[in-house]
């Protein structure tokens, strides 16, 4: 699914598109589902200004966060455990992002947050390809769903959320909130990362009723 957020002011206008890549592999035997998040910033008009607050918290924020800037990305990891690393790629100035400086938008830009260091170069053209493939995948999936005269948009959005909660091996998450605490600082933590049979059966039943079986 793709989240679109439009910003407009007297200075200008732009749209932010957030998505995780998802599409069929070239040999049609599986899916391309990397653990990464793209943010495509589509410039519309003017010279809008904004700041990027990049504040990663690896290892559950239990230690100081180290940020290293390379020519290709910003690498982040915990001071006492460097195994959990994140890589931020961007067409914008990495130094400006790290220092939270004001950015003036005059053309399309992108950001990519990944758990893996990329072998191939990442640029705006690569990002557009990932966006188009992901968009086509979700359009094809919704096209196979039943259509209704009333509340079709609401039903379609609900089905898309249920589809997001399904793993490629068939498991279905109980909720997208995953492991949010009941209250900040408290010990009670409702962990929804696992496949609960009751919740999963209800989600699967709904998808079978309203959509065509598809990967």
Regions found by a protein language model. Name each.
Residues 1-212:
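Acidic, mature catalytic/reactive cores of soluble proteins
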